[in-house]
Amino acid sequence: MARKPSKTRPSKAKSGPALTHIGATGEARMVDVSDKPATERLAVAEGRVLMTRATLDLIVSGNAKKGDVLGTARIAGIMAAKRTSELIPLCHPLALSKVTVDIEPDAKLPGCLVRASVKVTGPTGVEMEALTAVSVACLTIYDMIKAVERGVRIEGIHLVEKLGGKSGHYRA
């Protein structure tokens, strides 16, 4: 049975910063950025894919059945950054200036450290694009090795750094 949407309105108490994607009556909305200046913005995100040492060795040696795991994941992450507005409903479509996805095998984890950097000159930031790039790159690694190891874990996806815009510099 389908649930009826709640008619409860959000509290009007000013206890902290307002959510920019929520309208006065609680509806989701896309933020109007038309009056914001175009400035250079950068976001960096990272995450980890944890696996056994044997699976990591298979990836590093290039002997995975599905092919070049790291190269495929890198391209998937770049593609995902460019399509973020199609995946996350209230994100603005952006003409990204640069997307890099770096994947470092790490025997100490064991696993792979995935890091994405996204740059734009525009009226809104690229945090979601960086996080989406990392998420999809990690998921691609998982997809390409799941037949070898079912216990693979994706962990720690987070924003590492953000530069530009009204809120300035952030570093985790």
Curated annotation (Swiss-Prot):
Under InterPro entries, the record lists: MoaC, MoaC_bact/euk, MoaC_sf, MoCo_biosynth_MoaA/MoaC, Mopterin_CF_biosynth-C_dom
Q: Which SUPFAM superfamilies match?
A: Molybdenum cofactor biosynthesis protein C, MoaC (SSF55040)
Its pathway, per UniProt, is: Cofactor biosynthesis; molybdopterin biosynthesis
Compositional bias (Basic residues): 1-12
Reading the lineage from the top rank, the first entry is: Bacteria
Q: Which residues form the active site?
A: D143
Specify one Pfam family. MoaC
Q: Which residues bind substrate?
A: L90, C91, H92, M128, E129
UniProt keyword list: Lyase, Molybdenum cofactor biosynthesis
GO MF term list: cyclic pyranopterin monophosphate synthase activity
Q: Identify the Gene3D superfamilies for this entry.
A: Molybdopterin cofactor biosynthesis C (MoaC) domain
Q: Tell me, which GO biological process terms does this entry list?
A: Mo-molybdopterin cofactor biosynthetic process
Q: What class of enzyme is it?
A: lyase
This chain's function reads:
Catalyzes the conversion of (8S)-3',8-cyclo-7,8-dihydroguanosine 5'-triphosphate to cyclic pyranopterin monophosphate (cPMP).
Q: How does it assemble?
A: Homohexamer; trimer of dimers.
Question: Under which name does UniProt file this protein?
Answer: Cyclic pyranopterin monophosphate synthase
| Organism of provenance | Bradyrhizobium diazoefficiens (strain JCM 10833 / BCRC 13528 / IAM 13628 / NBRC 14792 / USDA 110)
Lineage, opening ranks: Bacteria, Pseudomonadati, Pseudomonadota, Alphaproteobacteria, Hyphomicrobiales
